[in-house]
Amino acid sequence: MIYNESTSALETKREEACPTRSPQKSTVAPSANGSGRIRTRPFIFDKMQDFTTANQLRGLGVYPYFRVITSAQDTEVMIDGKPVLMLGSNSYLGLTNHPKIKEAAKAAVDKYGTGCAGSRFLNGTLDIHIELEQALARLVKKEAVLLYSTGFQVNLGVISALAGRGDFILGDKSNHASIVEGCQASPARFHRFSHKDMGALEDRLRQIRPDAGKLIVVDGVFSMEGDIIQLPELCAIAKKHGAAVMVDDAHSIGVLGRNGAGTASHFGLDDEVHLIMGTFSKSLASLGGFIASDAETIDYLKHHSRSLIFSASMSPSNAAAVLAAIEIMVDQPERIARLWANTERMKQGLLSLGFDLGHSETPILPLFCRDVMKAFNYCKRLQEEGVFVNPVVSPGVLPGEELIRISLMATHTDKQIDFALEKLGAVGKELGLI
């Protein structure tokens, strides 16, 4: 599942820390002389015993997390020695097993070794990092780009560095957990507005003094329900109130816009979005992330973003893989066209079966179950039928909005999609979802 908050999906809410604690669990044991009882573990580990939900799900045979795949991430994967159709991958362009990308990664290992042994700030900047930053800047039409080791670190490090004391951050309530973490790590005031509610956003902006620093942060494509932020309206509101706009394009790069350049490109608003964030673990078949902006902002982040300065730099093989993936994405626009054709085929098939897909506008298709155990059972039964999907429960979505998240790839065949529709429909009827 994907997290929207910093708490575990399977944890029940705990009370705030109490002034006293009673050491009367199995964390205590008789003393050697029998005169009393001593704890064998510190209090902080008590929560591990309180956390029982995962084992309960395992006992019911429906635990859906950490499934082990023994093959490449492709349209079909191997689990427990059996082939399973993959409908849960973020590899939108189907590039994770592309021979050209694998060769580029291997060549980078031969030239640079397996790692950089330091941060970008010190000894960890390679010429291939600079080459990739320049390629990304051209793609998203920004002056400069800065690479990070993961996408999560981008949001954590950029937001906390840019928004300081006395500033204000405004974010959509459905934003990814990494955005939330970045906002909470900043000393700025953090406000969340209801999902895609532009009226609520503007109401909040009106309450902030005009000369205060203001940053609006949103997902371009929301990762659970597949809808797109209404960027033209948001940018107009931001401009009116003197706010900067940052868009997380983790699920937009390779999906939306000119050559897969993302949400701003999709709407023709390249100059209205001040910061574009992206990841490499989805369409670009690798690992890492980036922030794109004007050169002055990027230079500031180089010297103030702690998740950049205090992390080892992106491995050379990862960087080489992204460069090769960008080249393929730009040179083969038919991949994005095929992704959208596959999305339409699956979407129309699901709608004809009677599934509720919410407001999805992208290759992310949510099948609403609106029940935790139905979502887990649906996932289990589908895998038994040879289809891999992801269940999403609270806090990934609000309670009562539980869903199965399907994501399409450009490399899915019509035959695979039709097979999936057959199984999704049959199991959906079996469980009373349609």
Region locations from a protein language model:
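N-terminal "arm"/small-domain region of PLP-dependent enzymes with the aminotransferase-like
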Residues: 2-13, 18-30, 34-35, 45-114, ...
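Active-site C-terminal subdomain of aminotransferase-like
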Residues: 241-244, 251, 256-361, 374
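Active-site phosphate-binding strand-loop segment of PLP-dependent enzymes
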Residues: 191, 195-247
